[in-house]
Curated annotation (Swiss-Prot):
Organism: Corynebacterium efficiens (strain DSM 44549 / YS-314 / AJ 12310 / JCM 11189 / NBRC 100395)
Active site (record annotation): 60 (cysteine sulfenic acid (-soh) intermediate)
Protein name: Thiol peroxidase
Keyword Zinc appears in the UniProt entry: no
Swiss-Prot/TrEMBL keywords: Antioxidant, Disulfide bond, Oxidoreductase, Peroxidase, Redox-active center
Role noted for this protein: Thiol-specific peroxidase that catalyzes the reduction of hydrogen peroxide and organic hydroperoxides to water and alcohols, respectively. Plays a role in cell protection against oxidative stress by detoxifying peroxides.
SUPFAM superfamilies assigned to the protein according to its UniProt record, in alphabetical order: Thioredoxin-like (SSF52833)
Disulfide pattern: 60-94
A Pfam short name: Redoxin
EC number: 1.11.1.24
Gene that produces this protein: tpx
Enzyme class: oxidoreductase
Coiled coil, from the record: none
One Gene Ontology term of the molecular function aspect: thioredoxin peroxidase activity
Residue stretches making up the Thioredoxin domain: 18-165
Length: 165
C-alpha cells in the first residue's frame, strides 16, 4: 500500500502503482460516449495515464487542460485522463473547455483503481482515485510513474512528457 497526503495528512491507497519496467495491467474504462476503452485498444501508441480524483475540482480540471495542451504536440501518443466521475460529467467538462487532444474516461464501473493501486483508502476523498501519472511505451511497458505526494498539488507534467522521449 502506498501513501499520498490530503492537506498534509497521510492518506493510504489501495496498493502500489505499476513499477517502471512492468507491463501495464489490462483495464476497461468508459469514455464520454459510453463506449468502453481498454488497454488493448491503445497498443501500438505511447500512453500517458493522467489519473485524478474528480474533474469538478479546480486542480483536477487544470491537469486535464494541461495534458490536453501537451498532447497537441505529441506524436503516436494517447493521453487518457481517468477519474471516477461519471462519463457525462467528463464529457460536459471537455466539451465546454474544447478539450479534444485527450480522451477522458471514467473508472466508475471497473476495477481500474484497484488494479492500478490508486483508490484512496482514507481522507474525505475515500473511494476516489489518487492523483498520479503513468507513462508507458508502445508495448505497454511502464517508463514513468508518479503518485503525487500531496493530492492538492499538480503532477510533474514536464517529467511525464520528457519520459516519452
Amino acid at each position: 500500500m502506498a501513501t499520498t497526503h490530503f492537506d498534509g495528512t497521510d492518506t493510504p491507497t489501495s496498493g502500489e502503482l505499476p513499477a517502471v519496467g512492468d507491463t501495464l495491467p489490462d483495464f476497461t474504462v468508459v469514455d464520454t460516449n459510453l463506449g468502453e476503452v481498454s488497454l488493448s485498444d491503445l497498443k501500438g501508441k505511447k500512453l500517458v495515464l493522467n489519473i485524478f480524483p474528480s474533474v469538478d475540482t479546480g486542480l483536477c480540471a487544470e491537469s486535464v487542460r494541461r495534458f490536453n495542451a501537451e498532447a497537441a504536440g505529441l506524436d503516436n501518443t494517447t493521453v487518457l485522463c481517468v477519474s471516477k466521475d461519471l462519463p457525462f460529467a467528463l464529457g460536459r467538462f471537455c466539451g465546454a473547455e474544447g478539450l479534444d487532444n485527450v480522451t477522458a474516461a471514467s473508472a466508475f464501473r471497473s476495477t481500474f483503481g484497484e488494479d492500478y493501486g490508486v483508490v484512496l483508502e482514507g481522507s474525505p476523498l475515500k473511494g476516489l482515485l489518487a492523483r498520479s501519472v503513468i507513462v508507458a511505451d508502445e508495448d505497454g511497458k511502464v517508463i514513468y510513474t508518479q503518485l503525487v505526494d500531496e493530492i492538492k498539488t499538480e503532477p510533474d507534467y514536464a517529467s511525464a512528457i520528457k519520459a516519452l522521449g
